[in-house]
């Protein structure tokens, strides 16, 4: 596949979502979401491992019930997180601790990082774009929740690298949505709030838009609040009801849990447009008395009662974002709803009550983030002009100082990219080395915040405590990724790192995963070829057997035996179902095609003979039929109307 011509065409925008993902591209000055191979503009963020292949998207979702243990969903909730922080997350698959303490996913006998799972979804998005554009894509802008910390942003970027993408920018989801909303409205100054409730995370951002400048004033959120939690609330309600009526606890039944999860998600969606919905799950379980079924009605009122605490949890971040921006709710000109969960009537009502105005519904909540990412790609490529995006860092960044105190160097909601330095000193006499521990968060004590990483500055000349001057510099790039350096002013000794947490993937691990992904791509292509050859072989066997049954009497016994042997050989090869036999199967298929041509030759020969028998005529010289009579060829002999000749 050729590389897309023109830089702007090669930059795609990807919304890597918890529940669904979407890819968009700039075309003719406008950004549009692209349909996948199944004809939908959103793709379920689900990956399934079967005995023979890896499935992504709708094919993975369709088989989830029968393969619950090996079907991975909502992996975005694990990306860049420590195992100890994910113990409350309930899934049908196994979450395990990696050697570095990160949360990984166990499938059969192998452990996968969430970045690897994310990479498989990104590969699907990449393929979708390439199929649409007709050329190879290498560059992408990928969105993340605004409240993602540095480790989660790094892990998302790693996923892009594993998928074979050059991630030229990481952009916050609410900011991307604001770009899509306000691209053609930026001539009018206004302040907007983007309320983004997706499948796994919640963000709220306050932005000021004027003269092509999109300036984020503040952002807040909750990376563990989203549609998955609403689904789980319904699931618990259904399982409690089932246990009361049958005495059976379904929590340890992976297949039943998967069926309940699918039913809960469907009910949640239906209750956005209906006042009640029926949930029927026959043969959900069984005991000594026979099969047990789940059947009940779920009303919108019951659903809203189940999720009321979850809805309330979105309000506190809204209050904090307004406070940090120095703006009251009544000064917000427009509230933009983003994420599939914002279709829920209770959410719409809550947003309306808090901000005192009807939310804006002019954007597609499922596609707007990817479209905004594509616009950002257009900006970076120079295809979209006169637009400036000023984003912020969501959390304060700083270091641990004497007594375990967290000392921020960059406060939250600081516009990025940014750089800031501060001078520190030693805590003990004669100290020749210092360890710099970098944290992100809002708590007063360092250990209550997220440790991003640490490094040491050595070779400091011995001196009384408080005498050495150590300059610590924080540099946050436009992706929100942190770089830190420390320099001893006296000796000139300096140590600089791009923050990589005590967890996270090393460059070697990423390179190995890239190689594995490339190898998987080769395996997938090999599997695809095998399936195509096998399908062709089965079709040929079927059609040849049918023809042999109907017309076998028209060929010699020797030819018939050759065809029967070729069919048997090809059937034996098909029954082995061995991908390594692809070339052998193709050869046997070719052989059957060759010998079965005898059937075709015999059929056409008989047809031609029959035709010749019916129409065997001559020109003016005439010819004899088997009975010796003369026949005149009507195609060549005109009949004289007068004498009838």
Curated annotation (Swiss-Prot):
Gene it is expressed from: dnaK
Q: What does this protein do?
A: Acts as a chaperone.
- Which SUPFAM superfamilies does the protein's record reference? Actin-like ATPase domain, Heat shock protein 70kD (HSP70), C-terminal subdomain, Heat shock protein 70kD (HSP70), peptide-binding domain
Q: Name the Gene3D superfamilies on file.
A: 1.20.1270.10, 3.30.420.40, Actin, Chain A, domain 4 (3.90.640.10), Substrate Binding Domain Of DNAk, Chain A, domain 1 (2.60.34.10)
User: For the modification Phosphothreonine, which residues carry it?
Assistant: 201
Q: Which family does the record claim for this protein?
A: Belongs to the heat shock protein 70 family.
| Gene induction | By stress conditions e.g. heat shock.
- Endpoints of the signal sequence: none
Disulfide cross-links:
none
Q: Which Pfam families match?
A: HSP70 (PF00012)
The yes or no answer to whether the keyword ATP-binding is present is yes
Keywords from the UniProt entry: ATP-binding, Chaperone, Nucleotide-binding, Phosphoprotein, Stress response
Q: Where is the composition biased (Low complexity)?
A: 606-629
Basic and acidic residues composition bias: which ranges? 630-645
Q: Where along the sequence do coiled-coil regions lie?
A: none
| Region annotation Disordered: where it falls in the sequence | 606-645
GO MF annotation, one = ATP-dependent protein folding chaperone
Q: What is this protein called?
A: Chaperone protein DnaK
């Amino acid at each position: 596949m050729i590389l897309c011509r023109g830089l702007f065409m090669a930059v795609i925008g990807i919304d890597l979502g918890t529940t669904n993902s979407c890819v968009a591209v700039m075309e003719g000055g406008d950004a549009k979401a692209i349909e996948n191979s199944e004809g939908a503009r959103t793709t379920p963020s689900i990956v399934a491992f079967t005995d023979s292949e890896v499935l992504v998207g709708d094919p993975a979702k369709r088989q989830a019930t029968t393969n619950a243990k090996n079907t991975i969903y909502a992996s975005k909730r694990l990306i860049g997180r420590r195992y100890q922080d994910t113990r409350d997350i309930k899934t049908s698959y196994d979450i395990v601790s990696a050697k570095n303490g990160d949360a990984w996913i166990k499938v059969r006998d192998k452990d996968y990082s969430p970045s690897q799972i994310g990479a498989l979804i990104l590969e699907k998005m990449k393929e979708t774009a390439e199929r649409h554009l007709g050329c190879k894509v290498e560059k992408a802008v990928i969105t993340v929740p605004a409240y993602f910390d540095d480790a989660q942003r790094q892990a998302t970027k790693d996923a892009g690298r594993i998928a074979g993408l050059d991630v030229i920018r990481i952009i916050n989801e609410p900011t991307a949505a604001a770009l899509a909303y306000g691209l053609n409205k930026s001539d009018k100054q206004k302040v907007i709030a983007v309320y983004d409730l997706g499948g796994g995370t919640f963000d709220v951002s306050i932005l000021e838009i004027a003269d092509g400048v999109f300036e984020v004033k503040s952002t807040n959120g909750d990376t563990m609040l989203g549609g998955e939690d609403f689904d789980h609330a319904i699931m618990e309600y259904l399982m409690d009801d089932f246990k009361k009526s049958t005495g059976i606890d379904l929590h340890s039944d992976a297949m039943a849990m998967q069926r309940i999860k699918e039913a809960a998600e469907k009910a949640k969606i239906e209750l956005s447009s209906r006042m009640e919905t029926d949930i029927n799950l026959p043969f959900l379980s069984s005991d000594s008395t026979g099969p047990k079924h789940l059947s009940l009605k779920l009303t919108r009122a019951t659903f809203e009662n189940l999720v009321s605490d979850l809805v309330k949890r979105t309000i506190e971040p809204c209050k904090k974002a307004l406070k940090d921006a120095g703006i009251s709710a009544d000064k917000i000109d427009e509230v933009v709803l983003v994420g599939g969960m914002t279709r829920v009537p209770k959410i719409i009502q809550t947003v309306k009550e808090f901000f005192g105005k009807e939310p804006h519904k002019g954007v597609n909540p499922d596609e707007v983030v990817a479209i905004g990412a594509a616009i950002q790609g257009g900006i970076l490529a120079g295809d979209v002009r006169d637009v400036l995006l000023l984003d912020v860092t969501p959390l304060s960044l700083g270091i641990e100082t004497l007594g375990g105190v967290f000392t921020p160097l960059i406060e939250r909601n600081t516009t990025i990219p940014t750089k800031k330095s501060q001078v520190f000193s030693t805590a003990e006499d004669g100290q020749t080395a210092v360890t710099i521990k970098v944290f992100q968060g809002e708590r007063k004590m360092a250990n209550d915040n997220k440790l991003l990483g640490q490094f040491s500055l050595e070779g400091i000349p011995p001196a009384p405590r408080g005498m050495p001057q150590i300059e610590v510099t924080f540099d946050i790039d436009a992706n929100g990724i942190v770089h830190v350096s420390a320099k001893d002013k006296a000796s000139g000794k300096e140590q600089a790192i791009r923050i990589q947490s005590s967890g996270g993937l090393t460059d070697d691990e990423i390179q190995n995963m890239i190689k594995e992904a490339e190898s998987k791509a080769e395996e997938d292509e090999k599997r695809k070829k095998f399936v195509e050859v096998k399908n062709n072989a089965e079709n040929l066997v079927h059609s040849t057997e049918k023809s042999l049954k109907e017309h076998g009497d028209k060929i010699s016994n020797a030819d018939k035996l050759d065809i029967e042997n070729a069919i048997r050989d090809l059937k034996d090869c098909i029954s082995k179902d061995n991908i390594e036999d692809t070339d052998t199967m193709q050869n046997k298929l070719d052989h059957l095609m060759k010998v079965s041509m005898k059937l075709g030759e015999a059929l056409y020969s008989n047809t031609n003979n029959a035709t010749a028998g019916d129409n065997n005529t001559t020109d003016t010289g005439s010819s004899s039929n088997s009975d010796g009579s003369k026949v005149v060829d009507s195609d060549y002999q005109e009949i004289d109307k007068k004498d009838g000749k």
